Amino acid sequence: MVDGTYVNSSVEAISGEADTAAVAELANQMVMNFLYESSSWLAQSTGPFLWKGFRFLFLRLPSSLLVYLINGTVPFYLVVLGSVFTPIIVYLILRSRVLSAYSRLKGDNEDEVIDKKKQLVNDSEAMLMGGPDGKRRSGFSSYLDEFLSAIKIFGYLDKLVFHELTKSMRTQRLEQGEVMLLDDSVGFAIVVEGGLHIYHKIAHSQGSTRESMPLPEDRSFDSNEDDLTINGERFQLLNKVKAGNPVSSLVSILKLFTDNHTPTVVDSSKSSPKQSAQVPIRQLISPFLDGNVERNKATLNMKQVPTAEYEIPSAERAGSNVSSFTQQLYESMLPKDHAAEDVREPLPEIVAYAASDCAIAVIPASSFKRLMVKYPRSASQIIQVILTKLYRVTFQTAHSYLGLTKEIMHTEVVLNNSTNFELPYYLQEAILRKIKNGSKESSVQESIHRATLRSKNVHAHNSPTPNKISRHIALESRDQYNPGDLLSNVPLSRKGSKTASSSSVSIPRISSLRHQKEAASSPLATLRRLEGNDSQNFAPLSSSSPMSVSEKPSVVGGGAHDNISQISFSSALEETEESSWRMALVESMFGYLGITNESIMPPTEDLLFLNNRASSGSSVCSVSSYSHPQTINQDLFRCLSPELVRTKKKAPRQKYTEEMPINVDFNTAKEEFAEGLETLFIPSGATIVEQNGNNKGLYYIVSGELLVCWKNEEDNIEYVLYTVKPGGIAGYLASLIGFKSFVSLRAKTDLYVGFLPIEVLERLCDKYFMIYLKIAETLTKLLSPKILKLDYALEWIHLEASETLFNQNDPANAIYVVLNGRLRQLHQKSKNEERLSRPTTQRKKRKDDNQPNVQVVGEYSQGCSFGEVEVLTAMNRVSTVVAVRDTELARIPRTLFEVLALEHPSIMIRVSRLVAHKILQRSSDIREPTKIVNSANGYRYDFNLTIPPSAGTSSWGNNSDGGSISYKTITILPITYGLPVEEFANKLVSTFRQVGRSTIGLTQCTTLKHLGRHAFDKLANLKQSGYFAELEELYELVVYIADTPVKSSWTSTCISQGDCILLLADASSDPEIGEFERLLINNRTTARTELLLLHPERYVEPGLTHKWLRKRTWVHQHHHMQFVSSQNPSERVDSKAPPIPGAPPNLIGRLKKRERLNQLTKRTQENFARLLPDSIKLTVENISMKYIQKKQKYYTPVSAHKNDFLRLARILSGQAIGLVLGGGGARGISHLGILKAIEEHGIPIDMIGGTSIGSFVGGLYAKDYDLVPTYGRVKKFAGRIGSIWRMLSDLTWPVTSYTTGHEFNRGIWKAFGDIRIEDFWIQYYCNSTNITESMQEIHTFGYAWRYVRASMSLAGILPPITDNGNMLLDGGYLDNLPVLEMKARGCKTIFAVDVGSVDDRTPMDYGDSLNGFWIVLNRWNPFSKHPNVPSMAEIQMRLGYVASVNALEKAKTTQGVVYFRPPIEDYATLDFAKFEEIYQVGTAYGATFLHELEQNGKLPRIPGNEPANGPGIHLLHRRNSI
């Protein structure tokens, strides 16, 4: 305790003092005294215990131990051994624990290696087996499945539309040997069980000779004969239809809608028995014939005289039966009296023969007529789908593959020759004046004046006299009238004509039919009226059936109306000159399209009722005249139409209501078409449309001539098919059913044309949907017989993802052309191959169990054809072809190909050239000699000794024909929410355009904008699939951007449409499986999947990539990319946290925290600055600046050519640039100089590969993608290896090698550290020689130092490195410059640097025996003329490099390789001490070599270095405001 008197005295002293300093000093003294007395008290209490403990530990215990040891006796040899082995033991402990830290970085476990390759095996085998469960798809299981598969050709069908179409469907079984007559009366037939053989009638000119038939050896390929004889008429096999495919062709489906559109009704009361017998034989013969065909047909061998009512339908059926087309056109132009002749109706051109018992399902033709009336828009959509498939399957295959463009364009030739809608001279002059003298001001004034006149016409409609301001054009001098002429339809003031064709009948309006229906009191009254004597009401209906365009019908009118202008056009008396010729142009185009007032209106229920009457009458006639137990026309049930039944209470039915256009009127349609019409002047020689280019619209020639040209791709010669003269049209097929032109349109003279843009045509045809019916009707009548035959035999094949097209070893019975989608070609090992590769040891057996039994050969994309080789050589399929995604194909049967080859020998020549080109392109190595002689040095090389590149995943995404990457669609999919998908995708799309690929990016918004009003209805899928197929033809690459939630249908669409799927991930987030990835796995897609890891800076933490890839065995490749969203560049992307509105407070808190940390760091540096030396202080400052006070948070590359987006775009588009660095020991230091020259010339590098020292330098450059750190690490490594003392300390007993390899391992590990190859910024690989399994190993994953060390393990100097039981040595023994592996990975341009030793080709001649003493004397004799004989070690080295020498020569001659060879022959393999000298040699050579290439124009084109082609996608961002 402190004495109280002392305290009192101190207080008194303080109170007496007033000085502040004295008070402070006194307080300090008090505190010191207090501490002293407290410490003395503690010392007195604890001092004895502390002293006793100290004496025991430091005095008694050591003294007792020393006394014991000193007293003990130790032999001298133990002291010597201890002094010798103690430092050794300490060194070994330090070496194993400290200096050998690299040894803890073991290679990947064998299980991990197996799992890495397991997904590729599962993908391939699952696709081969037809499903991920390993079970092969065994086809369909029921009739219903077969039927549903066949009606996919109709596209999407609504439920009620489907029921309406199929409620009259019947099934029929055919026994073996029965024949089915395929004409329009059958309907839509589908094979649901068994198979049918389609036969085509042989022309009489060909029937007399056997030259038109296939050779006997060709027909022996099949078990059945290829010809058939019925009633003395020969038929030739055209196709074999299997279960699930339709028997009807695309044209025959269109005819089901178009033929007998307004049916003929015969009055039964007035029809005589003679007239009732005048029914064509086609309606009396059953569609099915048994073996007694001739006997049954003989009973019907009678002369039939068809009446006028059946003339037009029979003519239409004749066209559908592929008869003589030109004869059909001319007969249709003849009067009815001449067309009616006593002829015996022959069998149809197409018949179906049941090779075995089979079953078919038939939808009768009446169902299509009923569908046309009840659901006209749905029927129109079906017609659009069929027209599109007709264009894509038949026309496009005939044009691009078979070269039958002339036959396709024959349609337009017939159309222009059969009709003529030439404008009058004065209207032509008006159009020419408008084009020549027209201006914008006059156009505006004219439009204003016309609008004023139209407004006045409304008031002047009832006035007796016309307005004086209006202009009148009198048309008086006309010799003849044609459809589309101004006298018939153009509303001008003109004089009516009383002359008309005798065959013309005025057609009543639909309103009159409706009025008749309303006037009927009951359905019975309607029935009586139909059966009554007053049949004149229906005479117009019988004459209003669709007629051929070539018939040139006269003007609709008659003597009942003297002035047609006062009756038909009373609402438009006032018009201008421009509106007149516009209307005339539109009517002329309508005439070619077959559009009339009746055809533009949807059918009504009256026509349906009449159709039912006509069909029922014909069916009764058919049954009564000829009955057959297998006739499908027999009605099993007799039903009445619901319209004929009247009940007191009728339950309301749910009807499928279709959207019908408002104010559908013929005049309104003409006005809307006229508004979109344009007039153009085209100078002579100008090309309007290029061949295979996008069509722009429909052209009507007003004045001048237009050439239709076709260029043969084989001889590159352009042919003129025909000339379009004034009054004709051009672009008919491309405008109406397609969007690409098969021919070129070129102006022969100065052209004045009326132009209807395709956008206007599509918009108005969608509004007036019944136009498609007339288009289909006109088209089916104009097609040539050859195209019709081709259409019947070609098949449209639709495959879903992972569905097998054909299997390996199946008979080759067809050639396939890919319309859209993607397929993968797989090859399964045979039993002999499996027996040869069977393992012998237990370890190898476990490893081989997971080796792929299926190999990916390649892939087929849009436009590719395959199967020609097997068909021409009559061999089985050599591989299996499976669909990667939804795919459409055109199938050309072998029988059709043989028929076409006989009729058109040019097709056989064309296909043979195509096959030869594919074979040469696929196996380019075969055409090169295996043994060559270099013309430069005269040395011989054998390429048979080279090692082929590893299979791996190089074939995934590569085209099977050309070997290059051919992705048509790419999907960008995030792994989780919160990633900037759209911003990243837009930048990638812009980059694709920069590298020369026409690319379009699709988001949900852009797709919905295209779908328009169909965005959310059930037609969206149909419209969407057609839209995607069209985009794949218009653009080289389509990018699908999954910018919607995971449950959105757009996300699933993006996954199903991608040839390659890019998974977007934030590298700094948690590497767990995201919700989008789960959706990807559930969809079980087999498309190539690549992972994109986004980093804010160009640095990858060691082992980070392995964490991402370990759980994702479905990822085939990965890429590291530097990307920071521009929306918030100062923060990383947080994938888990959703966007929070209150972000600014968090930002302010982080800024305050960072400021406090900066102040603390600054004070710490100031406190230690006085105590630390300058070296340590500099180190601390560097660390502080690097990790704490980083001025620039994100690293931005200085060189623009190192853009990561450009690198990704080049890789995905097959334009990657590779760098291959060869081995050569210390000579490889020159690689640094080459890299410096490459960077200075702005050449980017996308992939790096190397061998030996090339793998070391290339790995360091791929790790950082920067030359500065690479230079420093290589120089440090060269210093360690060049140290003599380090090498001497690493020597060992030379049993396997002279050194232990420890110093070498440590030097490599010092350079790479713990990083893995997956963590490299650039894709990288190195090779090594596996002396255990005698093969080349390609290393693309694992710890970098191990496999770089394996690639640098020179035999004798370093021991082989072990990897999963295999001993690996230097890769230079097999391939010192692995260029072929780089080429197999899809690189187009490869820079190869060779620094190996020169191959010694000195000729030797020392006799048949050799004395070793003479060899020694010869080496020391300076006057000897004999070269030095190699030693045993040199011979062994040459033997080891035999394969490498030949591989090097092959790499030099590989296409796309730029070969570097620095002058480093004067330097040895171990001259690492000459680092700077060798580096300068490489720098000088690289700069000079690249400069010479650039000057001579031999430097390859670098995609991405040029400015972008076309405008990029500009994003709208929010401004950076607080």
Swiss-Prot record:
A nucleoside 3',5'-cyclic phosphate 2 binds at residues 778-918. SMART domains: cNMP. Residues 443-468, 485-523, 535-556, 828-852, 1125-1145 are annotated as: Disordered. The active site is at S1252, D1370. The chain crosses the membrane at residues 74-94. Its EC number is 3.1.1.5. A motif (GXSXG) lies at residues 1250-1254. Keywords: Endoplasmic reticulum, Hydrolase, Lipid degradation, Lipid metabolism, Membrane, Repeat, Transmembrane, Transmembrane helix. A motif (GXGXXG) lies at residues 1223-1228. GO terms for cellular component: endoplasmic reticulum; endoplasmic reticulum membrane. Belongs to the NTE family. PANTHER family: NEUROPATHY TARGET ESTERASE SWS (PTHR14226:SF29), NEUROPATHY TARGET ESTERASE/SWISS CHEESE D.MELANOGASTER (PTHR14226). This is Lysophospholipase NTE1.
